[in-house]
Amino acid sequence: MGFQVWQKGLCVLCFSLIFICGVIGEETTIVKIEENPVAQTDENYVCATLDLWPPTKCNYGNCPWGKSSFLNLDLNNNIIRNAVKEFAPLKLRFGGTLQDRLVYQTSRDEPCDSTFYNNTNLILDFSHACLSLDRWDEINQFILETGSEAVFGLNALRGKTVEIKGIIKDGQYLGETTTAVGEWDYSNSKFLIEYSLKKGYKHIRGWTLGNELGGHTLFIGVSPEDYANDAKKLHELVKEIYQDQGTMPLIIAPGAIFDLEWYTEFIDRTPELHVATHHMYNLGSGGDDALKDVLLTASFFDEATKSMYEGLQKIVNRPGTKAVAWIGEAGGAFNSGQDGISNTFINGFWYLNMLGYSALLDTKTFCRQTLTGGNYGLLQTGTYIPNPDYYSALLWHRLMGSKVLKTEIVGTKNVYIYAHCAKKSNGITMLVLNHDGESSVKISLDPSKYGSKREEYHLTPVNNNLQSRLVKLNGELLHLDPSGVIPALNPVEKDNSKQLEVAPYSFMFVHLPGPTMFSACEKPAGK
């Protein structure tokens, strides 16, 4: 396929790829977009989590969780409901560290205390808590009424014994390791799954076993052999319970920090697994004063991040494995994120880049930590007012289709561009992130290849303050109306004979509805 690149008055004609010509300051930048998709995501790729941390969860003197746990969150709040409905469907992952301390009420006559109490003498530093049947019904009613899908995290430690052993190597004491051994007691989980089916909760997309008990363990570890045996039990259990339903929910595990050796053994031993999940906090600590620089320089694209993605893809692509890869939890900075960073415009440089990069490497779903709770929520804790990343997530969901196109940029290191087949047209959607604080990105589009018109969604911070919790779309402030309705996200239509321009330190989604030269993006009639 032909393309033309204009550079200082020179027209160069080449073939096989579709090129775009861009200008960064005085530099000419060439953007290459391959015509054939290199990966495919789920249609509802964007996912968000609801955790279990209580109000007493604090990091660095900051206690940002409030009543955001799915045990105590106000599920009738209009803003929350409206925010979730805008995705319809939004994949919601229920779980987190304390899911392995959660038990499920089996009779309404049983006492059921839903509070996790701090106690450093106990596993994970918290007491057990209980999910009541009434609360489970409320959660499922919320999922149904908001048009969502649920992925629920089961307690994988029930029945196991925790052992603490010293680590000695070459005569030196290296600390302690905490391991959970023994068989998984699945009786409580079995009740919850059976109860859910009897109640007709068909919006449960999958059941996840455990949280961060494998891979690079942070608190308690389970061996890959034991974890595989437990996952097999869960598969047998769900298959038996759903045997008359035609389809069954997904079996998802392990939801851990990736470790190549551990994941390889676990997945090799678990051919029944549908989804292999890993968690990502590649910005480092939420207490890091240098977090702003990490975001602006995109230094989170380090070798550890790349090897994690590539390693998991190699495992799931091995013969005999049917599992696909999800990011089951990604908050950027661990320990609740950082106030003034994770909940502001600047965090979009991490979030949007990771959405794009993950999709390129055939990740099917990307679950943001959190919908609300901590400093990294898409919605602010307590007020539920959308943070800037909420609008970025919603635009991605609406504009970026499942087919992923590979891009290559020649001429600058400060710009990242991702491209997908468009969600609702036969064209493509590009996402352009300008990490340059001084110069705009200017890109020329050939109307003969991309059509005559485009739709721009340009996101910029209020008053050019990168740490603003407010964001503008095409120069207009985005805010809720008095009744908590999410604002319309309307594009500006531009003529493709004119360059598109992305301001310094900003992002832009560009929808090119076509007709384009991307035949792979053409949808069947009526779709």
Swiss-Prot record:
EC numbers: 3.2.1.167
Alphabetized SUPFAM superfamilies for the sequence: (Trans)glycosidases (SSF51445)
Keyword Hydrolase: yes
InterPro entries attached to this UniProt entry: Glyco_hydro_79 (IPR005199), Glycoside_hydrolase_SF (IPR017853)
Coiled coil segments of this chain: none
Active site: E212, E329
Catalysed conversion reaction: baicalin + H2O = baicalein + D-glucuronate + H(+)
Outcome following mutation: E212A: Loss of activity
pH dependence: Optimum pH is 7.0-8.0.
Impact after mutating Y281A: Loss of activity
Gene Ontology terms, MF aspect: baicalin beta-D-glucuronidase activity; beta-glucuronidase activity
Pfam families for the chain: Glyco_hydro_79n (PF03662)
Signal sequence bounds: 1-25
Gene Ontology CC terms: membrane; plant-type cell wall
Alphabetical keyword list: Hydrolase, Signal
Domain of life: Eukaryota
Family: Belongs to the glycosyl hydrolase 79 family.
Function statement: Beta-glucuronidase involved in the initiation of H(2)O(2) metabolism via the production of baicalein. Unable to use glycyrrhizin, gypsogenin-3-O-D-glucuronide, luteolin-7-O-D-glucoside and apigenin-7-O-D-glucoside as substrates.
Subunit composition and interactions: Homotetramer.
The protein's name in its UniProt record: Baicalin-beta-D-glucuronidase
Species this chain originates from: Scutellaria baicalensis
